[in-house]
Amino acid sequence: LYFYGDNVLYQCYARVADRYKDNNRYILVMDLISNLRRYQRREYYRFSCALEMKSRPLEKEEAEEKVEDKLATDLPLKGSIIVDISGGGLRFVADYAYEEQSLILCKYRLLLNGRSKEYSLIGRVLSVRELENRRGVFEHRVQYINVDAGEREEIIKYIFDEERKTIKNKREHSDLLKNEE
């Protein structure tokens, strides 16, 4: 079964316990046989993080090309913080707001195999909202446009590597606490 909430989808398994007809409507009584859990419809897993990023809007000519190789390199970039990243895009916060549906250049570095690599990717701003608890700070959701398959795979590899590190650290921390008891 799937349940829709406020912009959220939940899923569980259920068994039909009873069925009957009432006022020309068929009614099913269901017994839940699993816990209700949030269902993620995304194509890519989102990894929570705090990474520095620099960005700028694309010029009209650049937006028409949508190719990273032909971007102007001398235009100023603004700083921001990526708060989650996936193989399909990212979410970042900044003290400025881009226009929704605009194309932007996103530049950030990821540590892969012990080496830092810079990514310069074009993204479409899907949504922008001012944070309720931090006036003047805006959250942006961005979807990558024309990202190279190799770069997408590297980003996904980075996410899985970081998740592995997090799980390992939690286990080690848990083991330390058990040993202290």
Q: Residues of each region from the PLM?
A:
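Structured alpha-helical
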Residues: 1-181
